[in-house]
């Protein structure tokens, strides 16, 4: 069912289609960059954590292709996914007199990918960029699909654009240097795909969680590829999130509220999504959409994955609602939640009674 060979997936968006290449050791091979960068001016943007690990490898590849390569290192952390850091990127590009033919590479996790993608969308009204995600979360989710953004103090990802990369290059060897907490945060998004789209994949994850945590190369390549396949299918159908793409936000309405209330960076995005997914599943159970056994399966796999599965002690129902009503899925003042309707399917539900949401939040303080 799964092998360690390199995987290649295409995101089909007509003339804006692009490849996702997945495998171990891709940083050793310039072929994946050559058609997009050979002889070009290239700016690699990364953070101070990733730069010592991988920047020299990427710069060496680019130089072997005859590129004029520059490096910009930014601070590391969700709190730096901001307009201030965006301005820092703009200043670097302007002061370097880079023209519209520059190629920008996002080398890092979700923060770098979102920030650099938004910068590429805005610089001179749009320049080419390549995603080279180095965390599991960014490899399976944020690097694919063209969502780019920075945060505002009042809400996550509120300032952004849909802007597709020219290519996504995923070297699974990056995961060997990833702290386990960051790896677990990525697993939250992996599990999400099984819950909303693929019951067979959910079962596979339940059976192979230990293999993933031991960084089994075959298991990782298969899991990442399956997530990217699902994301590519969804994005091809609904690039701008007017329909099915909203399902990818399972757990995110609750999760974004946690991140915004407790301060960006205190909870990792995937951690907040995990707790939010449990709250969404409990809401679905209270609404009669899933049964106890299905809820238990969702709770169990997230718990086994060493992720937070309870409501943060310090957050009240009102804290949640303040942030959730700013969610981008709110339409005409009505909160819309992504809820599982079984393991393998989900739907967007409007007008869930606030009493049900309150009970779900409270239940998830102590549920086990």
Swiss-Prot record:
For this record, an example GO cellular component is:
cytoplasm
Which residues are recorded as binding NAD(+)? 76-81, 110-114, 134-135, 147, 156, 174-177
One Pfam family from the record: DHQ_synthase
Cofactor: binding comment: Binds 1 divalent metal cation per subunit. Can use either Co(2+) or Zn(2+).
Which cofactors are named for this entry? Answer: NAD(+); Co(2+); Zn(2+)
The similarity annotation says: Belongs to the sugar phosphate cyclases superfamily. Dehydroquinate synthase family.
Write down the species.
Vibrio vulnificus (strain YJ016)
- Can you name this protein? 3-dehydroquinate synthase
């Amino acid at each position: 069912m799964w092998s360690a060979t390199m995987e290649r997936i295409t995101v089909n968006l007509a003339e804006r289609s692009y490849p996702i290449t997945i495998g171990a050791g891709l940083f050793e091979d310039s072929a994946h960059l050559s058609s997009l960068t050979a002889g070009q001016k290239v700016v690699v943007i990364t953070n101070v954590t990733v730069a010592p690990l991988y920047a020299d490898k990427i710069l060496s590849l680019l130089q072997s292709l005859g590129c004029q390569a520059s490096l910009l290192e930014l601070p590391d952390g969700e709190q730096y996914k901001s307009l201030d850091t965006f301005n820092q990127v703009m200043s670097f590009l302007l002061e370097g007199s880079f023209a519209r033919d520059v190629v920008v590479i996002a080398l890092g996790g979700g923060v770098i990918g979102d920030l650099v993608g938004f910068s590429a969308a805005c610089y001179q009204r749009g320049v080419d960029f390549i995603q080279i995600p180095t965390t599991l979360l960014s490899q399976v989710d944020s690097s694919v699909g063209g969502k780019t953004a920075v945060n505002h103090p009042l809400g996550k990802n509120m300032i952004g654009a849909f802007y597709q990369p020219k290519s996504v290059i995923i070297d699974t060897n990056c995961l060997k240097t990833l702290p386990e907490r960051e790896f677990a945060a990525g697993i939250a998004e992996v599990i999400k795909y099984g819950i909303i789209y693929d019951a067979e994949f959910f079962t596979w994850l339940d059976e192979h969680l230990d293999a993933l945590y031991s960084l089994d190369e075959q298991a990782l390549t298969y899991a990442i590829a399956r997530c990217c396949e699902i994301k590519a299918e969804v994005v091809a159908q609904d690039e701008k999130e007017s329909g099915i793409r909203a399902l990818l936000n399972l757990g995110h309405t609750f999760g974004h509220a946690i991140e915004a209330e407790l301060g960006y960076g205190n909870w990792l995005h995937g951690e907040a999504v995990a707790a939010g997914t449990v709250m969404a599943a409990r809401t679905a159970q209270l609404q009669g959409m899933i049964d106890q056994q299905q809820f238990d399966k969702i709770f169990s796999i997230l718990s086994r994955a060493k992720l937070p599965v309870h409501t943060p002690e310090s957050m009240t129902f009102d804290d949640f609602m303040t942030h959730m009503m700013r969610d981008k899925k709110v339409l005409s003042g009505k909160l819309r939640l992504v809820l599982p309707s079984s393991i393998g399917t989900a739907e967007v539900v409007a007008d869930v009674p606030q009493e049900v949401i309150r009970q779900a939040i409270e239940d998830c303080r102590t549920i086990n």
